[in-house]
Amino acid sequence: MSGSSPARPSVVVIGGGYAGVNVAKSLDDVADVVLVEPKDAFVHNVAALRALVDPGWLPRIYLPYGGLLSHGRVVQDRAAKVDAGRVVLASGEELPADYLVLATGSSYPFPAKSDVDRTVDAHEKTLGTHAALAAAGRVLLVGAGAVGIELAGEIKAVWPSKQVTLVDVADDVLGGPFRPELKAELRRQLAELGVPVLLGSPLVTAPPTEPGELRTFTVQTQAGTEVTADIWFRCYGVIPVSDYLAGGLAGARGADGHIEVTPTLQVAGQDRVFALGDVSTADRKVAGAAGRQAVVVAGNIRALIEAGSGAAGDAGAAGEAGPAAGAAGLSEYQPAPPGIVVPIGPEGGSGQRAGSEDLLPPEMVAQLK
């Protein structure tokens, strides 16, 4: 019809975490965006451990999706089967897509990440676990990476007299490409708080209770050290969420569950399917990297739209042939040098700034976190 507006391309973003939300918001003005997310609110996971010891933080970390998109919509559902150009939800609804963005992230044991979909249930679980933790005199944290170290600091900041023990099979704290000086500083601060760190020897058997359950038990490391605790938490175990991939996309899923991407963050072998954040092979699994990747993905989809690829009815569905990356002027994601911020309570911790030799002092960690 004369004078009618051209159809806008459809973009389906699967996953409403840091990466997915940023991509969806950035493309809301140029596409019909559908954000698919099983949770009823955005979860600010960075503050989840603080909320466990201080439930007053709960309203700050669960942020409803209402008002996120001006033109698009948020669908509270789970992706059950995703192929290029088509998303089948757990409810049975099917969503066509000119562009697909896979931003489903990863799962991680509670309390670092919520494992329930409704905010009311998440609040109830956190409050119950807080009460159990408050009543415990001795706490075992299995895993001495960033989560275990941070949780130890949060617990000691609120309950200084609690006995908190960290145990890890690794020979040092904070696995990954980080400077020995940073690891030494974190060990020093933990020792200053009276937190024993048992390294280089796994537990003979897992604790006989569920994580977060208040019940006294004793476990032993293979080195022979016994640890008695009243409650424990699992502080390891990142698992990419990608089991929904089907058809031509299934081949992009690696043995470890990560989705293989090109430097432009397109899924290998696909022109209009992108993956980013924890679920992709693009970079380290931190919120900052997800945000930087979102800028690249949103910019590249916008470039493809402006180049004429993918408007509804023009070039078919996601995954079909479109202009080459060079022809559309797509940007490549450049991973940053290793960097991390590890708080130990509200006033402690340290970090490694990307590309810098200097360690972050505790006061800067407090500001950044």
Regions found by a protein language model. Give the residues of each.
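FAD-site-proximal beta/loop scaffold in flavoenzymes
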Residues: 118-137, 226-299, 303, 319
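C-terminal, flexible cofactor-proximal segment of oxidoreductases
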Residues: 284, 293-369
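Catalytic nucleophile loop
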Residues: 17-20, 145-149, 294, 298
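Short glycine-rich anion-binding loops that position phosphate/pyrophosphate groups of nucleotides
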Residues: 19, 105-108, 238-240, 347
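A Rossmann-like FAD-binding core segment of flavoenzymes
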Residues: 72-77, 81-82, 87-88, 95, ...
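Short glycine-enriched, charge-decorated loop/helix-capping segments at active-site entrances
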Residues: 48-54, 114-121, 249-250, 357-358
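FAD-binding core/adjacent interface of flavoenzyme oxidoreductases
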Residues: 2-10, 70-140, 233
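Beta1-alpha1 glycine-rich phosphate/pyrophosphate-binding loop at the start
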Residues: 2-73, 150-178, 353
